[in-house]
Amino acid sequence: MANTAPKVPLPERRDAPEVIDQQAAKLVNLINKSKHFIIFTGAGVSTSAGIPDFRGPEGAWTLRAQGRSRTTKAVSTLQAIPTPSHMALLELQNRGVLKYLVSQNCDGLHRRSGIRPEMISELHGNSNRECCRDCGKEYIRDFRAVATYEKTVRDHRTGRKCTRCGGVLHDSIINFGENLPEEALKLARDHAEEADLCLVLGSSLTVTPANEIPEVCGARRSSKLVICNLQKTPLNSQAHMHVYSEADALMTRVMARLGFPIPAFILKRRLVIKTGVDKNDRQVIALNGIDVDGTPVSYLRSVKLEYNRRVARSEPFTFNFRDALSPGTELKFELEFMGHYNEPNLVIDYQVQGDGAPEAVYDLHYDPNTGEWMTMRE
């Protein structure tokens, strides 16, 4: 992997709006004919969210090469709103048009936008994801789950332990010189081999071996490679078309021509409330966040039970009851979130389940534009 850039970055170029319109029409024609359409994203897909790229005029490696500091304010990846491009990809996934997504980005915005875990290879990791190397259990955090690297960049320990086996948790970030995750890379290559159309959004395609994924498509006559990037790339000669444009400018036109809406970003959380019995035969109620595939997600700061002075401030969020609660007993839990999107507290009405139904699952949807929660019980 390359962690450098020239002192003078490659010039950026922007096609005229009417040219982008024409190229969007051509791309839509390719998408409509495609049987296995994949997308490869780089930092340029997140720049409109306020997250800097690497090799643009204000890119991280460009600034390092020039020995100067950033002149524009960057947005925290935890507070960044997924861009129109992120949300367009979500809509394409949900409609079955997009078959697979490969990303070089560590910002976690694809997953936060709603891309399903089985639909994406995050080749360089995810700053919100950590895992146990002993048992393989993964965890998603609503905070930066990255090691300090105080001793060495090869030390990926985050300081937390696996709740399943007690093993040490490691971040998922791939630092320069490290191998890419085998399974994610294999899935990316498999889909690239099957793809008849690959769209690159916002990548300079200079970082190996990730750039080999779109190259697989560009090298085959049976597939077409389309690149959307403001700078030239090493794969331009293999590309069927290069759109010199921001990702959002192209994707908004593509979605309009496809007749698909670009959905607004909704922060989606899943909450599981379980009842059980502890070693002292006391009834226990536990609250936990999960992802769509059951992966634990840490997004709660605290949980408070109505008429109970105790506030649970760390995972697992549990409440013990000396006397057993009868089925049908109603409880109110007040959830406090991390608040990266200014989420207000939310009160969950829970009815104690009988022995046959010890678990209740809630879908919690938050709209950052209105500041309101919507709660649905499955």
Feature map (PLM): residue ranges:
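Conserved catalytic core of sirtuin-type NAD+-dependent deacylases
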Residues: M1-E306, A312-S314, N320, L325-E330, ...
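Short, compact, well-ordered microdomains
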Residues: N345-D349
